[in-house]
């Protein structure tokens, strides 16, 4: 595990502990489980991706991200609702919205604003380590949550996956290498993200996805993450029968993120 990931997880544990003192899990659970309208309004994250792919298009998870630990502020002019509308207009299947405050300058409000502004399902992009965060995610409107294998042991991963599914959310499990893939394949979810960014060096290479593909069964929906910068990168993945993408920085640095999505994928 990288030093930065360790640091993030330590902070995340403190954040969850503080949140529980402010509001108990029992109280949050009662709110989420008692809100039948919100449960009925969950948008199918996996279904949206598969519908795009079935129509011969790329299934694009378009990310809304203001900053990152390695790059600092990526988009100073940051309006989540406007970005979400532009993504939807230009063919995105889903949203990914950063809610981590300290390291990515995200916020729960950004998730709420983005999802309310459009009809796309939304992923809470954060470092999930406790069931409490899943109830938070659902209360904010998330349709999917992220589990990062590098950050979790298998028992906790399985517990978080089961909790998310009970709440009606999809689960995207993220891996960086073959060892993590072996652990991820023990989960039930079909959504398998391959992050092309090395957690130690922060360098990116699409070869990471290509190397892991032969180990993944066809029933899994492979989502390649990071390192998608040019139309040639997209073609390289689609030629390898990878049709789902999570892209953030390439869109966020453009004047209009949705227009850049259209340029990159059409």
UniProtKB/Swiss-Prot annotation:
Which PROSITE patterns does its entry note?
IGPS
- Alphabetical list of InterPro entries matching this protein: Aldolase_TIM (IPR013785), Indole-3-glycerol_P_synth (IPR045186), Indole-3-glycerol_P_synth_dom (IPR013798), Indole-3-GlycerolPSynthase_CS (IPR001468), RibuloseP-bd_barrel (IPR011060)
Per its UniProt entry, which superkingdom is the organism in?
Answer: Bacteria
An MF annotation (GO) of this entry: indole-3-glycerol-phosphate synthase activity
The pathway entry for this protein reads as: Amino-acid biosynthesis; L-tryptophan biosynthesis; L-tryptophan from chorismate: step 4/5
Q: What family does the Swiss-Prot or TrEMBL record give for this protein?
A: Belongs to the TrpC family.
Q: What is this protein called?
A: Indole-3-glycerol phosphate synthase
What taxonomic ancestry is recorded?
Bacteria, Pseudomonadati, Pseudomonadota, Betaproteobacteria, Burkholderiales
Gene this protein is translated from: trpC
């Amino acid at each position: 595990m990288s030093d930065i990931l360790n640091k993030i997880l330590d902070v995340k544990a403190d954040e969850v502990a503080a949140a529980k003192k402010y509001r108990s899990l029992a109280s949050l659970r009662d709110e989420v489980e008692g809100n039948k309208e919100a449960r009925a309004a969950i948008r199918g994250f996996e279904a949206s991706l598969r519908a795009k792919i079935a129509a011969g298009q790329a299934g694009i998870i378009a990310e809304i991200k203001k900053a990152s630990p390695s790059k600092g502020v990526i988009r100073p002019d940051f309006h989540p609702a406007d970005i979400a509308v532009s993504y939807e207009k230009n063919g995105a299947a889903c949203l990914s919205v950063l809610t981590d405050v300290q390291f990515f300058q995200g916020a729960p409000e950004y998730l709420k604003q983005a999802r309310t502004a459009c009809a796309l399902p939304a992923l809470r992009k954060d470092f999930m380590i406790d069931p409490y965060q899943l109830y938070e995610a659902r209360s904010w409107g998330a349709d999917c949550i992220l589990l990062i294998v590098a950050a979790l042991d298998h028992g906790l991963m399985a517990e978080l996956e089961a909790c998310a599914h009970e709440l009606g959310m999809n689960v995207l499990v993220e891996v960086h290498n073959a060892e993590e893939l072996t652990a991820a394949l023990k989960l039930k979810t079909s959504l398998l993200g391959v992050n092309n960014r090395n957690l130690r060096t922060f360098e990116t290479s699409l070869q990471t996805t290509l190397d892991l593909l032969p180990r993944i069964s066809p029933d899994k929906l492979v989502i390649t993450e990071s390192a998608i910068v040019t139309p040639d990168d997209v073609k390289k993945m689609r030629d390898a029968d990878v049709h789902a993408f999570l892209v953030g920085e390439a869109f966020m640095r453009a004047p209009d993120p949705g227009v850049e999505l259209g340029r990159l994928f059409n």
